[in-house]
Amino acid sequence: MSSLKEQLAQVAASNATVALDRKRRQKLHSASLIYNPKTAATQDYDFIFDNATSALEELVEIDVRFKVFSRSLFSASSVNIDRNTQTKEQVRTLDQAVNAYLMLASAWWHLTPTLHATEWLVRRFQIHVHNAEMLLLSTLNYYQSPVFKRILNIVKLPPLFSSLANFAKAESVPSNLTIVKLFNDMDFLTLYTSYVGKVVKQKVTYTNQLLFNSCAFINLVAFNSNSEEKLERLVPILLEVCAKLLASPSDDCQMAAHTVLVVLVTALPLKKQILLAATETILANLADSASTKRCAFVTVCKLFQTLKGHGNVDQLPANIYTLFDSKISNDCLIDFLSKKETPADKFVTSYVRSIARYDHGKLNSIVSILKQVKLEKFEVRLIITDLIHLSELLEDKSQLIQLFEFFISIDEDMVLRCLHSLNLTGELFEIRLTTSLFSAERIEPVNGEDVVKGLEASKVAGLAGGAQPFTEFLNKNSAYICTKNISLLVEDDEQASKLLSLFVESVGKKYQPGLFLSSFFTTLESRITFLLRIIVSPGAPVALRLISVSNLSKLIHTIGNDTNVFTLVPVLIVALTDISKNVRAAVKKVLHQISKRPFTKRYFLNDKIYGEGQSVPMLNPKESESWLKTFLDGYLVENYDISQLLIPKKNEKMYLLFWANQALYMPLPQPKLVLMRFLARHESFSSTYSQLWENFLSSYLEQRPQWELKCSKNKTNFCEFESVLVLLLSKKEKNPAAIEFLLGALKSPFEQLASIMAKRLIEIYPTLKQPVQCQIVQDIIESTASADLSYDSIETLQSLALSADVVVSVIKQNMINVDETSNIIKKRRRRSSASNKAALQKEEVSRIAEIHLRKLTILLEALDKIKVQGSEALLTSLFDILADLDTLDNDGGLPVLYAQETLASCMLHTIDSLRATGATPKLRSVRTDILVAAIRASSSPQVQNKLLLVISALALLNPELVLHSIMPIFTFMGAHSLRQDDEFSTMVVEKTVKTVVPALLESGSSSMTDEIEFLLMSFSTAFSHVPKHRRVRLFTTLIKTLQPSSSIAPFLFLLSQQFSAKVENFEIAESKSILEFSRSFMSKFAVLDQLTGIAGLFELVKLLSEPDLKDKTSPRTLLSNGILNYTPSEMFNYKRNTFDFMDKILAEDNQGGNKGENNLKLKLLSALLDPQTEEQVKSDVKDQFAKVLQHNLVFINNVEELCSTQDLTEQGKSDGDESGSEPDNDNPVADMTEILFSLLGHILDLLPISTFVESILPLLGKDTEDIIRKHLTLVIGTKFESEPNSSATYANMTASSLLAIVTDEAEAPGVVQAALNTTSTLVSKFGDRLDASTLTECLKIGVQKLNSSSTDIVVSALAVLTNTVHVLGVKSIGFYAKIVPRALAIFDSVQDTKSDLRKEVQLSVVLLFAAMMKRIPSFLQSNLKDVMRAIFFADEVQNSISLYVISLLVQQLDLKEVLKTLYRIWTTDISKTGNSVAVSLFLTTLESTVEAIDKKSATSQSPTFFKLLLAMFEYRSVSTFDNNTISRIEASVHQIANIYVLKLNDKIFRPLFALTVRWAFDGESVSNLQITKVERLTAFFKFFNKLQESLKSIITSYFTYLLEPTNALLNDFHSGAVSDTNLRRLTLTALTASFKYDRDEYWKSTARFELLAESLVNQLANIEDSIGKYLVKAIAALASNNAGVDEHSKLLHRALVEHMKASCATSQKLWAVKATKLIYAKVGEHWLVLLPQLVPVIAELLEDDDEEVEQEVRTGLVKVVETVLGEPFDRYLT
């Protein structure tokens, strides 16, 4: 019986959708999957139904199974169905229909129609309440999609889904971990697996759902992987759901089950019975698709891999084996295993053992299965043991031969161990299987008789073979009895194999061998040859071979002595190679037996032994007797190699011929193989003997299939047979038939033979004659080019030891331009002809051309790989090939790029090998024009690069050969190769330059200079196309190869033209790139080369200035690029840009690009100062530097002439010059001069300081032009800036010279200014390292120049004084009186002017004072006010500098004096100015001073500070700034005041505060009579409010000083005498803060309270609406402060009630209500006693005519009172 709780839950669930009130019904109806509740609440069922039916129709089109619901859930009658009025049966039917719909719809929740259709079920049938479980289960796999969020938002979550409750209204979606924890609940898992079973049964599963199920179950297993107990609880549930999935015909369902099973058994290995049951279930309903079968097989394998312990690889149960065999075919099994997707050894072992037990017909397939999997040793042992047992039962034991051969090949020892464990030996088992299995060293019986005696029928025949009379055996096999007098050596292999097996069987049944032989072979000849065949048969067991030897001996005794049995010896000699020592010993005995017989002329079976009518040439009896005795004397049984004994040295040729015939006529493959091996390995075997084999070799390719079959049936290794066969092709082979066999074998379709022959060819090729070699190579090339061969002909060809002569011969056979190559004098390249093109367009000719190209390619690849020693003929032939390729490319359009590249490699190697030999060939027939043409015509950069390397190599081998092609080569390189951005192309260009250019230089040609300049032009033209990161290395290589001394200048000249063009076209990035390159480029050369190049560039620019230039220099190549055609303006721009280019090259790169060890300046210093540098080098460097300097000065002196081309501008215009006819600068002379002086400075800067000073000081004399002296002076400053302090001596010398210039009254102002600036730099740089007299002189001259009429000179003088004062400090005090007043006067003189130098003057004066502050601060106090005024009013100086000077002032000077000075300067200057910068700096200084001043000083200066403070409070009345600016200033002042007050104690601060109050209220100490009382009060209350925020309760008692004045002020506000809203707000804020921060019951004093309370409340009468809230807060704060004093509360309450009467104004009542509401909200409990007096007032206010008042009371005051009371207020009103 269910519990009461459960009964109540059922009742609640059934009534979940019963709504008894309107709100409940509306809430139920507004639950929607699509619409928000407000929209859903307005919709009727008809609208929802129409949408749903339309959506259902769309779903029906997708899945027709939805149609059934159109007659139930979506029928027209469903609109009127109310599940609350249905019977239980009807409700159950309805739930079943809903559940069926949800299971079907589960697959389509990602579609909009599903939402709209399900919306009907939610709205009409409330499935989110009654079918919530199924709704959630069917959509759970959408847990991270928006649709699931919608469902969670409306569904009533069942208890099992409670973990999803947190996501119902949240923004986030359930995580993967949430789902795992949900499934970890066993009750939920049971529920979900039940649902899975239902969907599988209903056949409504789909891929995403199954994927979710699999992932959920897998994650669940992983989540509990550490808890074996939990996993064991999961096993039955998961196995049940897997069984349901496997029962489905769906591929997806089965795959899902496979996945889950694999993970489950991996986490928790299961019992074998469970795994077998699972396997049976997997196989029972296995789908036919290949993917499902593969998945099932992998699963089964993984299941079996988890088995542990004894019996884990037992045979499969019969029903499972049968089931597996019916579902998965053998081919599928092998295919699955070959993919090796999973370990399968355990299953395969069980499966193979099952085959051995149940299905003997499939034994033949076991090997193919085992080859695909690697088994453990114990698994192999079990299978072998099973098969050995099976051999006892199996009638046809031949099925096991292949199996045991496989096992023996992988582990022979294990097979023998298994046999021994079953009391079997290897030889007996061989007899049982009627074949040879084991190697002889493993099984060694004593002799044949012992074997026969030891045989037991049961061990040989097995349990299947019982005792059988011989007659019965004979009758059964009578068909195989041989009655003819024939040789069994040539008998059909099938017949012989059967007789062999019968012989083995008879021996195994213990029949006497003689009985078998006499019964089955009626003639002696057939018996003997049968035994011979067994003795040399690899398929016969060793024991049987021993028995055969024994019986052969007996039969020989029966042959008469008149018969010579030497015919048997060759076969017995083969038997001596048997791997069994016992067999060899037995055979030796037989040979001894034969040697003792008479050697007559009648040979036994001489014409029949190798075939009927085959008469084999034999040795004469005497020779045969002698040979056999000699052989037996030398033979030892232990000796396996008998080749030396076989063919003795004496009569070697005769014996070689004899054995060659024996090998030729031998019909059996194994003996033939042995004899051929003996022959081929003999040192005397040659092509002479191979002639015997002509017929055999000629027919072998046709008969090869028969030989392969024969080897297979006789168990002879066919690969070994053919390997020995090809050995018949001897070294130095010349037999045409043998060569034809070789070529035929290579072209044959037999891969094995072709590969073996290829290896043999590689071995014998070097010994062949050249014609044969050529024939073979040509044949290989032709066959490779025309057909697909079965061996790697390319590798074979590349492995041959080709010689240059062979290659040349083959090349000649493969040429198409033979007529042209024969004429070696021709130097013109062959031109393409229309006839050639037309011919090559024909299909047949085109095909031949393609084959020809393939031939050339094959040959070139081989040549490239082999690296043949080069010769002139070979190199000539290679150039002929290049011509052929040119023809095929141009005329035939064939792809020759690869061939050309390979050819280039061959050429390179050939040339290198010629150079290595030291040969100097004339190479007259080598046509470099073809090479150059190929380079130009090729579209491949790789080919071009390779061919350029060929040219480089040729230049090294024979320089004259390439000289006439230099120009085309470098033209091409400039247009193509330089543009390639790869390391190889760069290397090629560099190598070409390094090899070809020296050839040009060494040639001594008269036109060499022109060619070099042409080369430079070619390369420089391509400059912009060369990748940036490769330029420096490339062009450095070029110039170094061309000799830097003569080529840097032309190259820079060409580069400067490009730079100028980029600048004129505003291509800034490109011009910078050229500059960066030039700096790096120049740094790669020695200092002398750099200076020579710069001087040369000056000379070339000078050359352009000569008159009649065009006519004069027209022959020069360097000027042939159009520069002579420049218009005058273009020429001017070029020169200007070139000088700028030079200047920037020499300038130090600020970013460090030119400051490394390769810097020209450093190199110059090293050359001049390094003691190891030779004097000649120093002299040369100085000479070149002098040239550079001289050129620069010449251009400066002739700058007017240099710019005179501007006069021709108009002429240029008239001649049609439309491009850039005007220079960029309006003053070209000044522009050019500036650049030249900058260049001069950088040139001089290169010198070491000592040389620099010696060189430059003489130039400062009067004889030098002023402008040059000015620039030189500036250069001095720049030079010394980068010098170390150790150069102070030179600086002192320079400073003295400069001061001498300054003192000269006749000097030009510009020179004087420059001298002062440079002197300032020197003083700043070297400081006290300069002589004291020099520094004193600086002060004197600086003071003197302060009186100059030139402001520029004054500024420079101030700079000198600043730096000198900074250095001398107190020592400069003697000049203080002369400096400061004059500096202040200078400052004042520019303040009211618009001078261009106003900023510079202000900055100079400020910096002078800063220096004095640092060095002589105490002396500066006498002029502190003026100094500070100068700082404040220096509005042109940057803020950062001013702030720095102010920080110095605060740090260095006495702060008391500073504070006094600030007060004075405020009153006299700052308060009267409109300069915002001055005010800002003043406030900054004041703040810094206040922050830095100590408390003692602050106390002593407090009167001064407060005077300043009051003066600043009055600033508002006199300032011209806007209100916002003044407010910001006041805010800063308040902040500063707060900081200062914190440094004072109460004793000091109180009187000052009282003074401030009196100033505010009474006007005491007012300095500005224009300020009004309201302004004073406003300023005061702002200050007081900030003070209260900072000090809080500390200054609450200070309110005493302003209590009565404030009360009077409040009364004035009430009466209207004062009506300033802002002041009123500030006053109320001050009162609120004071009430709020009162911690000492200051305001609980009755006197103070009564004085202020009424005045404060009276403000309600006329408070402005904008500040009413401040009044409410003040009243509430006062009430809160006095909450514990009942009398005060009553007084305040009565006052408030007075303002809420009906007679009061609306605003007055409203604010009074708000004040009362806030009071009750804060201290309601204390005011509850006053509530009775308030109730009538509230009742009256609730009936107030003003709606706003009524609403405020009803919704505000009443609600607050109810909150305090804890009960409705209505009962107080009744």
Curated annotation (Swiss-Prot):
One Gene Ontology term from the biological process aspect of the record: endonucleolytic cleavage in 5'-ETS of tricistronic rRNA transcript (SSU-rRNA, 5.8S rRNA, LSU-rRNA)
PROSITE patterns recorded: HEAT_REPEAT
Alphabetic keyword roster: Nucleus, Repeat, Ribonucleoprotein, Ribosome biogenesis, rRNA processing
Principal cellular location given in the protein's record: nucleus
Localization terms from the record: Nucleus, Nucleolus
A Gene Ontology term for the protein's cellular component: t-UTP complex
Protein name stated in the entry: U3 small nucleolar RNA-associated protein 10
Gene giving rise to this polypeptide: UTP10
